[in-house]
Amino acid sequence: MSTYAGKKAVVTGGTIGMGLATAKALVKAGGEVIVTGRNEKNLEAAQTELGPRGHAVRSDTAQLSDIDALGGIVEEKLGEIDLLFVNAGFAQPGPFGHVTEELFDTTFAINAKGAFFTAQRLAPLIKDGGSIIFTTSVANDSGNPGMGPYAGSKAAVRAFTKVIAAELLPRNIRVNAVSPGFIHTPTAGITGASPEMLQAFEKIGDEITPMRRHGSSEEIARAVLFLAFDATFTTGEELNVDGGLGQRINRPQGQ
């Protein structure tokens, strides 16, 4: 029997990419999942892919009222859960001098504030001994031009991971983060990116990643499930899944 059979999870930002891959892996193994998103077309497609053990719910991570409503839906449909994967995110790169207050606030509202309050409001529904996994980013500590608000918001989530891990120790709830590098997803993690921008972003990613390729959403999903269910003596950790990019390692010259 699968390790994940009967497990119940909530995946925010779960209608495409890494979130959907994680939800599909759980459902395939006999689990039951609620995924959230804002795009109606993506919600419908995710519901179709996940089938009867999946529940696609419209929810905006930036709105605390939506997070509270999500808690009620989770309690009604799943009761207690084994995993909360806080994956909803927003990225819109731009030079430091061009960042607007609106962009800054939106980025932090979704990536930092939304992540924090999703964990806070749903923690009472997590079983003792369960897991919270946050999505951070290789941008946390890389100093890449144009990534100011995004990098800052994800660095905040890295800090939340440690603090919440400490606070939930009495309940034996482990709190960890997965830190993706360049990953093949429909949006490449960039909100509103044009096809030309995505193509350029992919080329850069392959060039600077030591393993010379993008990761897949399924590789992120495996990392999430490892941290959630198999890494039973690990908490407060950030697992890099980035082809060596975050470790600043270099390929042998000429290879």
Model-derived features with residue positions:
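Alpha-helical segment proximal to the catalytic Tyr-Lys
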Residues: 124, 166-170
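C-terminal substrate-recognition "lid" of short-chain dehydrogenase/reductases
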Residues: 125, 213-241
